[in-house]
Amino acid sequence: MGIRKVNPTSAGRRFQTYATFEELSNVEPEKSLLEPLRRSGGRNASGRVTSWHRGGGHKRRYRIIDFKRNKENIPATVASIEYDPNRSSHIALLKYADGEKRYIIAPVGLSVGDTVLTGAEADIKPGNCLRLANMPLGTIIHNVELKPGKGGQLARSAGSSIQLIAKEGTHAILRLPSSEMRMVPISCKATVGQVGNIDHENLSLGKAGRKRWLGKRPHVRGVAMNPVDHPMGGGEGRSSGGRHPCTPWGVPTKGYRTRKSKRSDKLIVHRRK
């Protein structure tokens, strides 16, 4: 994917950059794999805001993605590489030999006409899916399962990848994008390769309006609020009241650990930095 700069004909366009999308196919999305997507605006079932800074944005339809890759030993051909408004990565439409169609996350190097396969006999090439037990050490992977059969959960965003470091008994040791080293059952599946659309992080939106098109609302600082809205609100001038940075509910932030202990902690070999 290339990045295109626009002429600075206005303040909003001065730093704008766009993706060129030359690797995408000029086709309509597969209708059988589309679902209506209703927006919540960050509200829960009772109508209260539980996730701030969400709302608005362009109307979308959800693309059903095959994260489980459970159609084994049936070859599939890549019919198209498409844009997905619901994620930073691109998606690939697969047509299986038996006629079924499915979307998967498109890795780097996958192009229209390529053949992909799921199973123990699959080659180590981008787009193929195998169990960790069948992969050589050092393999770069994405869409990795945490529990066998649950579907890929790790490394699904644009440009992300995981490296298979070691195998010990019933578990494999992975190096995650956060630099965390974690053990995962060796029977879990993963897809070979790095997630595509690597230049996504280099895009500059250029203006607040493009952020709103994505469904993201303004992020207001606590010190800019009134005392009734935030512990750091109010005061004369830019004062924080003398307390350390915290959330609207008084929980310390900026480095404060909030992760609760859980049984799966024993699977973490080395915590992220």
From Swiss-Prot:
Residues 222-273 are annotated as: Disordered. PANTHER family: LARGE RIBOSOMAL SUBUNIT PROTEIN UL2M, RIBOSOMAL PROTEIN L2. Part of the 50S ribosomal subunit. Forms a bridge to the 30S subunit in the 70S ribosome. Disulfide bonds: none annotated. This is Large ribosomal subunit protein uL2. GO terms for cellular component: large ribosomal subunit. Keywords: Ribonucleoprotein, Ribosomal protein, RNA-binding, rRNA-binding. One of the primary rRNA binding proteins. Required for association of the 30S and 50S subunits to form the 70S ribosome, for tRNA binding and peptide bond formation. It has been suggested to have peptidyltransferase activity; this is somewhat controversial. Makes several contacts with the 16S rRNA in the 70S ribosome. GO terms for molecular function: rRNA binding; structural constituent of ribosome; transferase activity. It comes from Syntrophobacter fumaroxidans (strain DSM 10017 / MPOB). Belongs to the universal ribosomal protein uL2 family. One of its GO terms (biological process) is cytoplasmic translation. NCBIfam families: rplB_bact. Residues 264-273 have a biased composition (Basic and acidic residues).
